Amino acid sequence: MAGEHEDVAAVRRWFERLAEHVHAVDFVGARAIFAEDMIAFGTFADFMTGRDKAEAAQWRNVWPHIDAFRWRPDIRAIVSADRLTAVGMAIFDSTGYTPDGTPYPRPGRATVAFTRRKPGDPWLANHTHMSLFRDVPTRSHKGKPEKVT
């Protein structure tokens, strides 16, 4: 059971790392927590194959335009018996902006599938599905600079 708790804690840490990258608008740093051949659904592209496409179509259309991205504490995860795959689900909150700069709440949800070569290795996301709750505007209009490394 100790391995299961460690694995779920590692899934939670992955979500926190993603939040750090979103806050910093750190696309380069975020690449390391996603599989190169990932598949994804998102707000700005119905179906994406590849981390580079997810970054171009999704991350760059969201991260620089929102503030205060955070996960709610109740992150859920299930881990396979061999401890090599997992699925995590979480609810997020962030602040979006109308074209005139008025802030609005921007809640949503995420399901992330993870993989790794051996137990104890960091999780890599090989599938993400992030979506806003109903009636939340999809486009936020703030602009922040990308982190330069």
Feature roles, as predicted:
Residues 1-36, 143-149:
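Short, low-complexity N-terminal intrinsically disordered segments enriched in polar/charged residues
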Residues 13, 70-72, 107:
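Short solvent-exposed loop/turn micro-motifs enriched in small/polar/acidic residues
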Residues 58-59, 73-79, 92-94, 109-116, ...:
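Hydrophobic/aromatic beta-strand elements that line small-molecule binding cavities or substrate pockets
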Residues 65-66, 94-105, 134:
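Short, cysteine-centered beta-strand-loop-beta hairpins and adjacent loop/turn segments enriched
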Residues 74-81, 130-134, 142-148:
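Glycine-rich beta-strand-turn "strand-cap" elements at beta-sheet edges
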Residues 78-87, 102, 114-124:
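A short, structured loop/turn motif at beta-sheet edges
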Residues 107-142:
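Short beta-strand edge/turn micro-motifs at domain boundaries
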